[in-house]
């Protein structure tokens, strides 16, 4: 009999019902035909998708998309592919792309593990961002955490030599786990001695700034592909 816990572990998300506002639904209806990429189990040519040769950065789980849009706007020489399954976030980021007139950002609403397995070529990415993934803070739910060895192994294969993997979390025990998992991958090396300072390209969110004022920590982990 197949282990149901393993079936859960290979997905990159747990689907939660989120209510789309009318504006988010409209933005998604108008935006996804322009900026969305449909899931197909075949390798895509990222240069063809974006219409140019430029560094390609993948973000898994962009939430409401505010930081993603800000990063794309501040780094027009890079191309960004964001993956998120929850409708309100996808709709909100479509709205931000339109408002900021971004041309270097594309979206997918699909399970990131399937996209990695079937659509992204090995050595095709210059960077991967996973910012503030669900911490699943109850111990019995820790197995649902996204950043675990099987996913990191997949991501390492998709990175070019010298490409980077950047994770950030505000849960210390998850930060410890992330560091352990990444240290355990022979293809990756830490860019810092333990945790890294927040790079300029990752914007400080309002939530994060408020937490820092209250004395809460945020941990950035940045590794490079050997």
Swiss-Prot record:
* NCBIfam families the record matches: tRNA (guanosine(46)-N7)-methyltransferase TrmB
- In residue numbers, the region (Interaction with RNA) covers 140-145
**According to its UniProt record, which reaction does this protein catalyse?**
guanosine(46) in tRNA + S-adenosyl-L-methionine = N(7)-methylguanosine(46) in tRNA + S-adenosyl-L-homocysteine
Q: Which GO terms describe its cellular component?
A: tRNA methyltransferase complex
- Indicate which residues the UniProt annotation says bind substrate: 138, 170, 205-208
Under Enzyme Commission nomenclature, its number is 2.1.1.33
What Gene3D superfamilies has UniProt attached to this entry? Vaccinia Virus protein VP39
Q: Which InterPro entries match?
A: SAM-dependent_MTases_sf, tRNA_(Gua-N-7)_MeTrfase_Trmb, tRNA_methyltr_TrmB_bact
Q: Which protein is depicted?
A: tRNA (guanine-N(7)-)-methyltransferase
Catalytic residues identified in the record:
134
Pathway(s) per entry: tRNA modification; N(7)-methylguanine-tRNA biosynthesis
Spell out the family assignment given in the record's similarity comment.
Belongs to the class I-like SAM-binding methyltransferase superfamily. TrmB family.
Q: Report the record's disulfide bonds.
A: none
Organism the protein comes from? Chromobacterium violaceum (strain ATCC 12472 / DSM 30191 / JCM 1249 / CCUG 213 / NBRC 12614 / NCIMB 9131 / NCTC 9757 / MK)
MF terms per GO, please? Answer: tRNA (guanine(46)-N7)-methyltransferase activity
- Its job: Catalyzes the formation of N(7)-methylguanine at position 46 (m7G46) in tRNA.
Q: Print the keywords alphabetically.
A: Methyltransferase, S-adenosyl-L-methionine, Transferase, tRNA processing
Where does this protein hold S-adenosyl-L-methionine? 59, 84, 111, 134
Catalytic class of the enzyme:
transferase
């Amino acid at each position: 009999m197949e282990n149901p816990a393993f079936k859960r572990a290979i997905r990159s998300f747990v689907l939660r019902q989120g209510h789309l506002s009318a504006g988010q639904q409209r933005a998604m209806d108008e935006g996804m035909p322009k900026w969305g990429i449909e899931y197909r189990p075949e390798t895509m040519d990222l240069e063809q998708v974006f219409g140019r040769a430029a560094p390609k950065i993948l973000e898994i789980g962009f939430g409401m998309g505010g930081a993603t849009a800000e990063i794309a706007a501040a780094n027009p020489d890079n191309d960004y592919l964001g993956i998120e399954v929850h409708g309100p976030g996808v709709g909100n980021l479509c709205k931000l792309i339109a408002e900021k007139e971004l041309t270097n950002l594309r979206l997918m609403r699909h399970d990131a593990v399937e996209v990695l397995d079937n659509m992204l070529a090995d050595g095709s990415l210059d960077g991967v961002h996973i910012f503030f993934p669900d911490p699943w803070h109850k111990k019995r739910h820790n197995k649902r955490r996204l950043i675990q060895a099987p996913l990191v192994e997949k991501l390492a294969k998709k990175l070019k030599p010298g490409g980077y993997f950047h994770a950030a979390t505000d849960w210390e025990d998850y930060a410890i786990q992330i560091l352990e998992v990444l240290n355990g991958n022979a293809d990756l090396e830490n860019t810092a001695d333990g945790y890294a300072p927040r790079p300029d390209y990752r914007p400080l969110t309002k939530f994060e700034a408020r937490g820092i004022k209250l004395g809460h920590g945020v941990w950035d982990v940045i590794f490079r592909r050997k």
